[in-house]
A protein has these predicted regions:
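Detector for methionine-enriched segments
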Residues: 1, 23-24, 37, 80, ...
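N-terminal single-pass transmembrane signal-anchor helix
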Residues: 1-24, 31-34
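N-terminal alpha-helical signal peptides/signal-anchor transmembrane segments
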Residues: 19-22, 32-52
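Short, charged/polar micro-motifs that form catalytic or ligand-binding hotspots
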Residues: 25-28, 108
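Periplasmic/extracellular, small/polar-rich flexible segments of pilin-like filament-forming proteins
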Residues: 48-147
């Protein structure tokens, strides 16, 4: 009897782990889909933004222009959150067509997969993006990579 319960317990743990991994894969796909749509919407917008002297955050105008995909929501006036809970903002800088999306990717068990997913998705738009920035939180120094 205990052997049967032990086998059921092991199978249950395996099923839960498999379900968790499958759900994360689903969310990563949804994140990539949302980011692709967001970038496709932001590229034309970025070319219409006025010149600025410093960084300027434009996240707040995205919902007003109906440019946010369903999987991304505004959480503060200048920040958005995707299906994985990753916070980000859309910005424009002083250079011509220099814009981007800054991501806060916290350390987590799936942090590496999330970063890989973001970079893989953004690579499709490399001709229109200047930098990719990422930070663990608001107090961490940012890490960027030019295209």
């Amino acid at each position: 009897m205990l052997g049967v319960l032990a086998i059921i317990g092991v199978l249950s743990v395996g099923a839960i782990a498999g379900y968790s991994k499958a759900m994360m894969k689903y969310k990563l796909n949804k994140q990539a889909e949302g980011l692709t749509m967001l970038l496709a919407n932001c590229i034309p917008l970025s070319k219409q933004l006025p010149a600025v002297n410093e960084w300027k955050i434009y996240t707040g105008i995205l919902p007003k222009l109906n440019l946010l995909p369903d999987s991304i929501s505004i959480i503060r006036s200048n920040e958005m959150k995707d299906i994985l809970g990753i916070e980000s903002y859309f910005y424009h800088t002083s250079g011509e067509n220099e814009w981007g999306i800054f991501y806060y990717v916290p350390e987590s068990s799936f942090g590496k997969e999330i970063c890989y997913n973001l970079i893989k998705t953004v690579k499709e738009f490399h001709a229109d993006m200047y930098y990719i920035f990422r930070s663990k939180n608001r107090t961490d120094t940012y890490h960027g990579m030019g295209t």
